Amino acid sequence: MLKASKGHLFAISFPFKKWLVCVLATLSFSALSAQIQNPPVRVIAFGAHPDDCDLGAGGLAAKYAALGDRVKFVSLTNGDAGHQSQHGQELAYRRRAEALEAGRRLGIEYEVLDNHDGKLLPTLEVREQIIREIRQWRAEIVIAPRPNDYHPDHRYTGVLVQDASYMVIVPSLVTDTPALSRNPVFLYYSDRFTRPQPFRADIVVSIDDVYEKKINMLDAHVSQFYEWLPWTAGELEQVPKDPAERKKWLGERPMAERTMQPEWREALEKRRWERTESCRSSAFAKAQMWDLTGRYWRR
């Protein structure tokens, strides 16, 4: 059995301060859980490739799904370049199947758009795809990467979602899909990039209780976590053959755990999202987002 022995946390950042006052709250998770009579919160997360959302928000999705809320992951590309030996439509088909299996394991929806991997550009066409996705999902919370990253697809995903963020409420644009009556809350995944400015964690939440669910979701992306990414790191021979052993191996990889930043710990303690002892003992942070705040944002 996988264990999050050193503590696992969500860290999030608000791209626009005006939303911060709408979302921050100091209620405990147990108090939030008691509010299950509320309509489901609708969350949509965007990534550049199948598996990006899983890494960035797998714990988030697990927590919301457990509350009966609605979560959808969207990959802007089909991932048809992310493998050392498979390519094109064969790989795209495989990665879509892996994404659907990952969503099934967690009880969320997963969609893979048919844009080419490594060739994503911030075009009007893709922006309108994102506007449609947000509107059709009737999203209240939208999550995306910051527009600074080593990978152009990641950067442009952040730019595209940012460019769509206001347009989702403009009725005269993308008229084939009804505009939202109010703007969702937009949030960034956590990251470790320091330029042009380091990531600021506005909310940090423990995901110890759903860490195994996140790893089980990542495990569905066989082409990535057991083939492509180990190959790029020169570690392919280290991947265990036994399915149970390789899942355990995956849970211990740096891609699944990140050293907790001091300022993230400060954010966690300041907002009192978890018990004091949990805060003090947490040594690791997830490449994750948040949960909890959607309930508070709803007026």
Task: Place the predicted regions along the sequence by residue.
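Active-site adenylate/phosphate-handling loop in enzymes that bind or generate adenylated species
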Residues: 133-179
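Flexible loop residues that form catalytic
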Residues: 79, 147, 191
